[in-house]
Design a protein with these regions (language model features):
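Conserved glycine-rich cofactor-binding loop
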Residues: 7, 14-15
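Conserved glycine-rich Rossmann-like NAD(P)H-binding loop of the short-chain dehydrogenase/reductase
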Residues: 28-44
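Substrate-binding pocket helix/loop in short-chain dehydrogenase/reductase
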Residues: 97-98, 102-110, 192, 203
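Active-site helix of classical SDR
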Residues: 121, 157, 165
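Alpha-helical segment proximal to the catalytic Tyr-Lys
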Residues: 126, 170-174, 231
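Residue(s) in the substrate-gating loop at a strand-loop-helix junction
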Residues: 141
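Short, small/polar-rich loop/turn modules that mediate ligand/substrate recognition or access, typified
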Residues: 173, 178, 233-235, 241
Length: 247
């Protein structure tokens, strides 16, 4: 278990991809703190971690609020130690066509999906630098590369996430801190299960592997990037999209 003794912070961990990532890092031996936007969500994370034999806890966090971020990072350090693995997974969508998009639909997505990387990464870097070890893993999207109608806000945030990671990787590499991104395609989640059957079928025709991805398949890639086996990987974006977009 290569992550034994390391503290990992996973934002947006109450379900789906975030939950799968939290459990995978825990399986590798990390102490995992997963965050949710509500106290009830944080409690569910704590229960899920405990049920799966993972040390750690759920915490309530608003990634768009400076004070909330500072409080959670302080609590983690006091209770568990400095987080040396950060997975920026929390994100929202506010879909609309550009002509109809309201200001708050744009700014809310940018603040939650992109500005949060600045807040959280800056908050953990001092501890990582002191330890001369760190893993920052940002969860992007295939939409950041190929675009998607009705999601100019989301696409901009996810494309920005990749540029952010490459620049930061250059800044902190000399301290043995790696910064990478994982860009999922369409994953089998509650959201995609609610799509009309015709829309799901049309979606599958765009995916050479002919199926939606599983959250656990994203988690396995994140687990690799967090491990010692990925010590020489930095500034990379790893697509996990079934061939929907090839670069």
């Amino acid at each position: 278990m290569s992550l034994q003794g390391k503290v990992a912070l996973v934002t947006g961990a109450s379900r789906g991809i975030g939950q799968a990532i939290a459990l995978e890092l825990g399986r590798q031996g990390a102490t995992v703190i997963g965050t949710a936007t509500s106290a009830a969500g944080a409690e569910r994370i704590s229960e899920t971690l405990k049920a799966n034999g993972v040390e750690g806890a759920g915490m309530e966090l608003d990634v768009s609020n400076d004070e909330s971020v500072a409080t959670v990072l302080a609590n983690i350090s006091q209770q568990f130690g400095q987080p040396l693995i950060l997975v920026n997974n929390a994100g929202i969508t506010r879909d609309n066509l550009m002509m109809r998009m309201k200001d708050d639909e744009w700014f809310d997505v940018i603040d939650t999906n992109l500005n949060s990387l600045y807040r959280l990464s800056k908050g953990v870097l001092r501890g990582m630098t002191k330890a001369r070890f760190g893993r920052i893993i940002n969860i992007g999207s295939v939409v950041g590369s190929m675009g998607n109608g009705g999601q100019v806000n989301y696409a901009a945030a996810k494309a920005g996430l990749e540029g952010f990671g490459r620049a930061l990787a250059r800044e902190v590499g000399s301290r043995s801190i790696t910064v990478n991104a994982v860009a999922p395609g369409f994953i089998d989640t509650d959201m995609t299960r609610e799509l009309p059957e015709a829309q799901r079928e049309a979606l599958l025709t765009q995916i050479p592997l002919g199926r939606l991805g599983q959250a656990e398949e994203i988690a396995k890639v994140v687990g690799f990037l967090a491990s010692d086996g990925a010590a020489y990987v930095t500034g990379a974006t790893i697509p996990v999209n079934g061939g929907m977009y090839m670069s």
